[in-house]
UniProtKB/Swiss-Prot annotation:
InterPro entries according to UniProt: Ribosomal_Su5_D2-typ_SF, Ribsml_uS5_D2-typ_fold_subgr, RNase_P
GO MF annotations in UniProt: ribonuclease P activity; tRNA binding
Keywords: Endonuclease, Hydrolase, Nuclease, RNA-binding, tRNA processing
Family: Belongs to the RnpA family.
UniProt keyword Cytoplasm present: no
Top-level taxon in the UniProt lineage: Bacteria
Keyword Acetylation: no
Function: RNaseP catalyzes the removal of the 5'-leader sequence from pre-tRNA to produce the mature 5'-terminus. It can also cleave other RNA substrates such as 4.5S RNA. The protein component plays an auxiliary but essential role in vivo by binding to the 5'-leader sequence and broadening the substrate specificity of the ribozyme.
Name used for this protein in its record: Ribonuclease P protein component
GO biological process entries: tRNA 5'-leader removal
Record's subunit section: Consists of a catalytic RNA component (M1 or rnpB) and a protein subunit.
EC number, UniProt record: 3.1.26.5
Catalytic activity: Endonucleolytic cleavage of RNA, removing 5'-extranucleotides from tRNA precursor
Length: 114
């Protein structure tokens, strides 16, 4: 079985999502999202330049990716690209916190779908 990649890799797609995507700010995390015609929902976790410490950044990335993967069922065949910009004050997030937050964000995004 082929592993599905949920990351946005293209610099052009990321820049376009920053320009055209909708915006939510929640507790030190900025979220940009846009509905897409692709057959998969994708995401990327990024940080401002002032966020030092690769170990902490990578831990936050892993937590976000795993929680996002588990919450994909809530999207119900609607496909959305997300960018999560995490600021340094949110470096000590735990799995349960991120899981609950992502669930609420996805429900909010689905309600805003036209």
């Amino acid at each position: 079985m082929k592993k599905r990649n949920i990351s946005i890799k293209s610099k052009v797609e990321i820049q376009e999502l920053f320009k055209k995507g909708r915006f939510i700010r929640i507790e030190g995390i900025n979220i940009f999202y846009e509905f897409t015609s692709l057959s998969i929902s994708r995401m990327i976790v990024t940080f401002p330049k002032v966020f030092k410490g690769a170990v902490k950044r990578n831990r936050v990335r892993r937590i976000f990716k795993e929680c996002f993967r588990k919450q994909l069922a809530l999207l119900k065949n609607r496909y959305v690209d997300f960018i999560f910009v995490v600021y340094p004050q949110r470096v000590d997030v735990n799995y349960c916190e991120v899981d609950t937050m992502l669930k609420n964000i996805i429900v909010h995004v689905m309600k805003r779908k036209v």
